[in-house]
Amino acid sequence: IIRGDSGIDIETVSVSIQNSLCFGLLDGTRQIGFARLVTDFATFGYLCDVYVLNDYQKSGLGRWLIECCHAHPLMSRLRRIMLVTDSAPWLYQKMGYLPLNRPDFVWQINRPDMYRKTEGK
């Protein structure tokens, strides 16, 4: 599933998937959800790209998808699992995630328009 508004090209999506532990959510043979874990496979994981198609939202499938991610044997050995999101904070809190509201603790370089094509190119 590639969100059309992301601006990310298919090659970048492919490389990101190849270098992640991925989880798919299917309705028959149709993919309706996705999540991936970027990890060192020992101590740290970054849960990202958690997505359920609009027609399937509000049915508990997003929570179930995250539960499936958490049930993977690798997850039990990770000391820290992080995610960055601006949607459904109530869901992630129910799943054991806590907001990091400590100053000078988490830092980032954020380039939100990295994959957007500029006009004229």
Tell where the protein language model's regions lie, with residue ranges.
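A conserved beta-strand-loop-helix scaffold within acyl/acetyltransferase catalytic domains
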Residues: 11-51
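Conserved acetyl-CoA pyrophosphate-binding loop and the N-cap/start of the following alpha-helix
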Residues: 56, 60-65
